Amino acid sequence: MARLPLPNRDDPTLDAVEAAVENNQRSDVRTYMGWSGLGHPCERSVQYDFLMALRKTFKTSTLFKFEDGHGTEERVNKRFASLESLDFKPTGPDGHQWGVSSLGGHLRGHLDGVIKGLLQAPKTWHVYEVKCVADAKFRKLKRLVEEHGKDALEHWDEQYFIQAQGYMGAAEPQLKRHYLVCVTPGGREMTSVRTDFQPKAYKWAVEKAERLITQQELSPRISEDPEHFVCKHFCSFKDVCHSPQVSARVSCRSCAHSTPIIDDAAGAPGNVKRGAKWKCEHHDKLLSNSDQKRASPQHLYRPDMLGWAHPHQFNKLDNEITYRTDDGKEFTNCETADWKNKRFTSKDLQHLNAETMESDASYLDALSRFCPSAEIESRKKKVKPDELNDDLPSWM
């Protein structure tokens, strides 16, 4: 449901503008694991992002921060470009952002630029990054630079530190220095920190990413308490992780049949835009990004992506998984829906939970909020869903 403007101030027009900004935000999923997020304190959150568990949306206040950050970055870039002694390249030869890629393209990132000619190290190329932060965090970095020098970034923000190591290590050719320009909103104050490349830290980060990409189960939560500080304030996947009412979105990434393939050729520097490889074991096909986002009618949830039930039995021949809820009720995730007998497609289960699937009325009510009326009628008549699906992946 779209956000409606609520009267929280004396100007309903401003309320309506904020609601429009929030409702119109782009909420596409990212198709790779980003270096910028790899250092998140909760590994499961990193996996949810990689597995396209939800389309992330943000509150208006956060969207305004993003706008401020992008605008400030442009201002800072213009300032650096005005110093003729600097060899400053905010984009690559093709006019696009510099991109880095590792693990067959599954682990990627985009640099704000590269720079050479810094007065404190004029002959050395640096990864160039701009971070716009609140005043308190800005002051903290200034203090840490005085205390720790080139080690300040690691003490200031571990997530930024891992991002910096990744950008240096994955660059072609590999870079040995990172230059972060930290600014307050609007760019009124600037400070900086230079960071050396640490091969051991880079190796550790790549190994962590490979483990999160290839392991067949989700990592433990950072906390079992959904009100934990990180869960509450710094995770977009709190609902799908902690709530028994929410399932991951249907895509090939959430399917038990899909497998990421780490092919170094696919992730070579010249192939950053080609995308990493995923394979559907059920259809024995490689999956394009568009295929992955849509999924096929044969989709079965990875058991750990259906958080409100536990797998009981897998029938490979019929392509179905039987689950049990905490109170012992059974249902089946399968290709063809028969909701009266508790047999559900993944698209059905995406909008259901242990409570709503217990009665016909509540099931239809839940389904009607998300599915076209023709698809609801097909459930009543037991028509195969794929007979109605005219938007199948290209490989079907």
Task: Please report, for each region that a protein language model flagged, where it lies by residue.
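Conserved active-site beta-strand-loop modules that form the wall/rim of enzyme catalytic pockets
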Residues: 124-130, 175-180
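A short beta-strand motif that forms part of the nucleic acid-binding face
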Residues: 132-134, 184-185, 284
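Residues immediately flanking
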Residues: 130-132, 237
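Secondary-structure transition/turn motif
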Residues: 111, 196-197, 279-287
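Metal-dependent nuclease catalytic regions and adjoining charged, substrate-binding loops involved
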Residues: 5, 140-145, 151-161, 166, ...
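Metal-dependent nuclease catalytic cores that hydrolyze phosphodiester bonds in DNA/RNA
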Residues: 1-127, 134-145, 151, 349, ...
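Short beta-strand element of the conserved SAM-dependent methyltransferase core
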Residues: 113-115, 278-280, 299
